[in-house]
Design a protein with these regions (language model features):
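C-terminal structural segments of small proteins and small subunits
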Residues: 63-97
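N-terminal first-folded block
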Residues: 3-45
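Conserved acetyl-CoA-binding loop-helix of GNAT-fold acetyltransferases
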Residues: 53-64
């Protein structure tokens, strides 16, 4: 079981750079997006290979989707990882643009 509490503490929203960034054990991951017309378009998720399988990408997607929900945004998942995540999590379907 992954410790997502630790993960949540390492994710930082950088709105000026339009991304969320995670740092864990000196390694990084990020999710990049653009905004327009009430839609957050998630373009890309990238995680350092040293972090693969540790829940970092999922944590980044959750953070981005939670932000979209709080801000009243819909989500267009151009990123294949985000699209797959949303398909597997029905609680996110209402966010689809």
């Amino acid at each position: 079981m992954r410790d997502t509490r630790r993960m949540a503490k390492t994710i930082e929203h950088q709105p000026e750079r339009r991304r969320f960034e995670a740092t864990l054990d000196g390694h990084h991951g990020r999710i990049e997006y653009r905004l327009g017309d009430g839609v957050m378009t998630i373009e890309h998720t990238e995680v350092d290979p040293a972090l693969e399988g540790r829940g970092v990408a999922g944590g980044l997607v959750r953070a981005a989707l939670e932000h979209a929900r709080r801000e009243g945004l819909k989500v267009d998942a151009e990123c294949s990882y985000t699209r797959s995540y949303m398909e597997r999590h029905p609680e996110t379907h209402d966010l689809r643009a």
